């Protein structure tokens, strides 16, 4: 029998062509064999979130927020870039998962039995309760029993809808509410303080942050107990992303990174003071504009708004302030400190601010390098208040009591112990008013949060006013001015009149405001 002569070159070419044709349909090519592999092949972790002071926000174009920072670190952990998509409300977030437009939802979402039926939860990292809010001065409900849809509105996709339904079925049959499909919880809280809405429901942490800028928002009652907060991902047979999240959070917890991030965003305390916050925000409007140039001039290693918060805590922005112990001026410097800094007049605002910054920089330079960069300021401020030697004692005490002396979250818990004899008697530098240093730093952080949020709100309002003006008075060509389609001369005369009389300018008036008055 004659042997068949095989043309290996022909077979090789044929096999290559067939492989090229079928390659995209092969499972390990057309798509990665698991979700983590797909993310790494794409080189991008897609995270959807909402814009709030806690989850994700931007200042001067730089993103920040608890969920953003954690998501960025998780992307780094996977070795990919982070892509953030901001949605308006929770319902839109879950649409992103359903439509395959997101790998993760990182937006302070609450774990509950309904959500986990359709979505995969990740590890929990803090907890919140759902609370009913109202405007100070308005009627405060003590129960949900008589609330109607005309009074209570909640955001779409809000976890509390399930809780409300349960309460309606079990306790309050007359309870009713409305869901606003176009607004998130933050916008609904704004509607409450503007008098457009009687009540809404939001989580306790979001409310606490909102009150720093809008102290007129008040909590009427708790709707739920504490609920864990988590991230969500698609629910299917692929658990690789869930496993990676678990490993990531375990690592963050073990090395203390998670505690430091939570301290940064959640460690400001929840002891909200309505009068103090309102007084501070009034001072922001009345006093800060004159001092802002000085804060901006001398703030070097820190943000000027933090410097302003420090000065307010020291003197309430009073250059003539004097304490019973003899400290004076905007930054409340002692006579000896002022002399060492070359300050000739402690009541001169510029000299005081300049000296205070230099003294704070000296404290910053003494903080050990082992302390994380973004926490060094809190150690320095505590030292600024009670003396650097006592800060050394606080760190030593933290280490002795099995805490981390480089973690502000751990050290601040030990500060009040510096005034208790069983502890200070065993320390190198003895008694110190550690509880005052603790309150000092916490107050500064609260003022900083209020100031940053309030200035952002002002900027937002100015932008909206400018956009409204552009809509009310659109640009027209010179040839159109003579056709009386645009009241140009009237606009100029009214603007000039308003400027000269210092009355509210048209630049910040809505179209038709005069019509409403008539």
From Swiss-Prot:
Task performed by this protein: Murein-degrading enzyme that degrades murein glycan strands and insoluble, high-molecular weight murein sacculi, with the concomitant formation of a 1,6-anhydromuramoyl product. Lytic transglycosylases (LTs) play an integral role in the metabolism of the peptidoglycan (PG) sacculus. Their lytic action creates space within the PG sacculus to allow for its expansion as well as for the insertion of various structures such as secretion systems and flagella.
Official protein name in the record: Membrane-bound lytic murein transglycosylase F
Family the entry assigns: In the N-terminal section; belongs to the bacterial solute-binding protein 3 family.
Region (Non-LT domain): 22-269
SMART domains in the cross-refs: PBPb (SM00062)
InterPro entries: Lysozyme-like_dom_sf (IPR023346), MltF (IPR023703), Solute-binding_3/MltF_N (IPR001638), Transglyc_AS (IPR000189), Transglycosylase_SLT_dom_1 (IPR008258)
Any one GO molecular-function label of the UniProt entry: peptidoglycan lytic transglycosylase activity
Region annotation (LT domain) ranges: 270-518
Catalytic reactions on record: Exolytic cleavage of the (1->4)-beta-glycosidic linkage between N-acetylmuramic acid (MurNAc) and N-acetylglucosamine (GlcNAc) residues in peptidoglycan, from either the reducing or the non-reducing ends of the peptidoglycan chains, with concomitant formation of a 1,6-anhydrobond in the MurNAc residue
Topology within the bilayer: Peripheral membrane protein
Keyword Transmembrane: no
Keywords associated with the record: Cell outer membrane, Cell wall biogenesis/degradation, Lyase, Membrane, Signal
GO BP terms, alphabetized: cell wall macromolecule catabolic process; cell wall organization; peptidoglycan catabolic process
A single Gene Ontology CC term: cell outer membrane
Enzyme Commission code: 4.2.2.n1
UniProt source species: Escherichia coli (strain SMS-3-5 / SECEC)
């Amino acid at each position: 029998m004659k042997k068949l002569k095989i043309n290996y070159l022909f077979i090789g070419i044929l096999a290559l062509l067939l492989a090229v044709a079928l390659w995209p349909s092969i499972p390990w090519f057309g798509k990665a064999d698991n979700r983590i592999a797909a993310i790494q092949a794409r080189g991008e972790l897609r995270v959807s979130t909402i814009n709030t002071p806690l989850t994700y926000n931007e200042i001067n174009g730089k993103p920040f927020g608890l969920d953003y920072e954690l998501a960025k670190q998780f992307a780094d952990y996977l070795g990919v870039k982070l892509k953030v998509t901001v949605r308006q409300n929770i319902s839109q977030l879950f649409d992103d998962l359903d439509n395959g437009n997101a790998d993760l939802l990182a937006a302070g979402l609450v774990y509950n039995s309904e959500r986990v039926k359709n979505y995969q939860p990740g590890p929990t990292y803090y907890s919140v309760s759902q609370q009913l809010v109202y405007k100070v001065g308005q009627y405060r409900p003590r129960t949900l029993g008589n609330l109607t849809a005309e009074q209570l509105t909640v955001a779409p996709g809000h976890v509390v809808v399930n809780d409300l339904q349960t309460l309606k079925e079990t306790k309050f049959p007359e309870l009713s509410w409305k869901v606003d499909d176009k607004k998130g919880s933050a916008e609904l809280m704004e509607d409450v303080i503007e008098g457009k809405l009687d009540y809404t429901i939001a989580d306790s942490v979001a409310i606490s942050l909102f009150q720093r800028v809008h102290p007129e928002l008040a909590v009427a009652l708790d709707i739920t107990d504490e609920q864990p907060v988590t991230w969500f991902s698609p629910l299917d047979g692929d658990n690789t992303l869930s496993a990676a999240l678990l490993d990531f959070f375990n690592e963050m917890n073990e090395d203390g990174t998670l505690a430091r991030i939570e301290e940064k965003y959640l460690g400001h305390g929840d002891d909200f003071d309505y009068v103090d916050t309102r007084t501070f925000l009034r001072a922001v409007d009345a006093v800060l504009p004159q001092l802002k140039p000085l804060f901006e001039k001398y703030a070097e290693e820190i943000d000027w708004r933090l410097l302003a918060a420090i000065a307010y805590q020291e003197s309430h922005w009073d250059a003539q302030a004097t304490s019973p112990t003899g400290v004076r001026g905007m930054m409340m410097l002692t006579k000896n400190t002022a002399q060492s800094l070359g300050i000739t007049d402690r009541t001169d605002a510029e000299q005081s601010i300049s000296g205070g910054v230099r003294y704070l920089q000296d404290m910053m330079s003494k903080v050990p390098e082992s302390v994380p960069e973004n926490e060094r300021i809190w150690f320095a401020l505590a030292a600024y208040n009670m003396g650097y030697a006592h800060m050394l004692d606080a760190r030593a005490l933290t280490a002795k009591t099995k805490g981390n002396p480089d973690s502000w979250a751990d050290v601040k818990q030990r500060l009040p112990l510096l005034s208790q004899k069983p502890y200070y008697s065993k320390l190198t530098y003895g008694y110190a008013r550690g509880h005052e240093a603790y309150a000092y730093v916490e107050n500064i952080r609260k003022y900083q949060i209020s100031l940053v949020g309030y200035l952002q709100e002002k900027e937002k309002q100015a932008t909206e006013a400018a956009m409204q003006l552009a809509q009310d008075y659109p640009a027209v060509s010179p040839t159109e001015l003579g056709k009386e389609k645009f009241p140009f001369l009237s606009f100029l005369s009214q603007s000039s009149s308003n400027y000269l009389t210092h009355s509210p300018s048209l630049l910040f008036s809505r179209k038709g405001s005069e019509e409403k008055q008539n």
